[in-house]
From Swiss-Prot:
Catalysis: reaction(s): L-seryl-[protein] + ATP = O-phospho-L-seryl-[protein] + ADP + H(+); L-threonyl-[protein] + ATP = O-phospho-L-threonyl-[protein] + ADP + H(+)
Keyword Transcription regulation: no
Gene name for this UniProt entry: CSNK1G1
Protein name: Casein kinase I isoform gamma-1
Binding site for ATP: I49, G50, C51, G52, N53, F54, G55, E56, L57, K72
Organism: Gallus gallus (Chicken)
Pfam family, one: CK1gamma_C
Length: 456
């Protein structure tokens, strides 16, 4: 009964222009009689791989190229829409720079706005779990050198990021030539620090509401000061120490209210000397943090100096920048199983450094990983074809950190790794639930309707 309609839809799709990239002005998505949900003329919507208060993250497929993509869906009537702003920032950043995902399309999808992005690999938080929640110095330095460059590029486009956390930095898909590159994603909380009209730096202000992730945000952000370039770099420094130490001194603090908890995190951060935070690690880690914390609000950071701190330490240790991260040789979690990263295929060896084994972290890692990943568990390594899927959860997970957002800056994302078929309804937002420390304070409950719905 549906064959004529399906054939008509296929003919319509094949008569369109460029196969890969659809512009903002392309026709709205359609749902064929078969129940297939489309975003624009090219992209078929698949199962849900993440959700949060922004809407949902779905797996998608480009019907022209047969490539998998990630599709972010946000209700058009969202209380604090951010998807179009994020799309605008991606366009402002451009697609030529290394370590930024390709953006293929933005447009309506029924009652939702949709943004189609390149599907990347797992986040640094996923990989941190995989490596028993500690990274070696070599891996952290290779990450740090790349992320200083990513942040320099973002800042060069007159944007500050304001959302540093391991979940927002992803490696490329395994088997892809960019699988070793650390990507930066999710610009929903970004802000222009250069006024587009006056071309001047935004003014210094105080009494600002918190924006970002409390675990990593700068001390000045806790104090209510307007963020600038210095704050992105300080947050990176906190994340680097998180990777080296396995945790930060201000994690796990108890308080009666969220406001009190944020206050305690900020107080502990201020009262922890850099020397104590970086104790038992190379002095260069402390040098980095001291420098970024002393920057003036308007000051342009010396990115070359910061990179040099870490590159010289890297060379002093005798490391080779071969991208032999700690996760190389381990099975990488994907939506359909796992992919074993074979270091032999890329001539990368792990002999240049020894992974620090911390058995005491194992039970904690297993529990935390199972709580957060759900069905995204690592299965025994097996052969897969070149079209295997990798996780794209970094924009939608919190990794145990308390997350805060200004009401004027959009909404935050959290992962619900429950798979869904392409004809499953995209559920609306429900109530906010405050959960324990291991979760996010902005977690949104989802109730799936029993009866299937179609977008008209």
């Amino acid at each position: 009964m549906d064959h004529p309609n399906r054939e008509k839809d296929e003919r319509q799709r094949t008569t369109k222009g460029m196969p890969g990239r659809s512009g903002h002005g392309s026709r709205p998505s359609s749902s064929a009689s078969s129940g297939v949900l489309m975003v624009g003329p090219n992209f078929r919507v698949g199962k849900k791989i993440g959700c949060g208060n922004f809407g949902e993250l779905r797996l998608g497929k480009n019907l022209y190229t047969n490539e998998y993509v990630a599709i972010k869906l946000e209700p058009i009537k969202s209380r604090a829409p951010q998807l179009h702003l994020e799309y605008r920032f991606y366009k402002q950043l451009g697609s030529a720079a290394e370590g930024l995902p390709q953006v293929y399309y933005f447009g309506p999808c029924g009652k939702y706005n949709a943004m189609v992005l390149e599907l990347l690999g797992p986040s640094l938080e996923d990989l941190f779990d995989l490596c028993d929640r500690t990274f070696t110095l070599k891996t952290v330095l290779m990450i740090a050198i790349q992320l200083i460059s990513r942040m320099e590029y973002v800042h060069s486009k007159n944007l500050i990021y304001r959302d540093v956390k391991p979940e927002n930095f992803l490696i490329g898909r395994q088997g892809n030539k960019k699988d070793h590159v650390i990507h930066i994603i999710d610009f929903g909380l970004a802000k222009e620090y250069i006024d587009p009209e006056t071309k001047k730096h935004i003014p210094y202000r105080e009494h600002k509401s918190l924006t970002g992730t409390a675990r990593y945000m700068s001390i000045n952000t806790h104090l209510g000061k307007e963020q600038s370039r210095r704050d992105d770099l300080e947050a990176l420094g906190h994340m680097f120490m998180y990777f080296l130490r396995g945790s930060l001194p201000w994690q796990g603090l108890k308080a009666d209210t969220l406001k009190e908890r944020y206050q305690k995190i900020g107080d502990t951060k201020r009262n922890t000397p850099v020397e104590v935070l970086c104790e038992n690690f190379p002095e260069e880690m402390a040098t980095y943090l001291r420098y970024v914390r002393r920057l003036d609000f308007f000051e342009r950071p010396d990115y070359d100096y910061l990179r040099t701190i870490f590159t010289e330490l890297f060379e002093k240790k005798g490391y080779t920048f071969d991208y032999a991260y700690d996760w190389v040789g381990r099975p990488i979690p994907t939506p359909v199983g796992s992919v074993h990263v074979d270091s032999g295929t890329s001539a990368i060896t792990r002999d240049s450094h020894v992974h620090r084994d911390r058995p005491s972290q194992q039970a904690l890692r297993n529990q935390a990983s199972s709580d957060r990943r759900g069905e995204w568990e690592i299965q025994p390594s097996r052969q897969t074809n070149t079209s295997y899927l990798t996780s794209h959860l970094a924009a939608d997970r919190h990794g145990g950190s308390v997350q805060v957002v200004s009401s004027t800056n959009g909404e935050l994302n959290v992962d619900d790794p429950t798979g869904a078929h392409s004809n499953a309804p995209i559920t609306a937002q429900a109530e906010v639930e405050v959960v324990e420390e291991a979760k996010c304070c902005c977690f949104f409950k989802r109730k799936r309707k029993k009866t299937a719905q179609r977008h008209k």
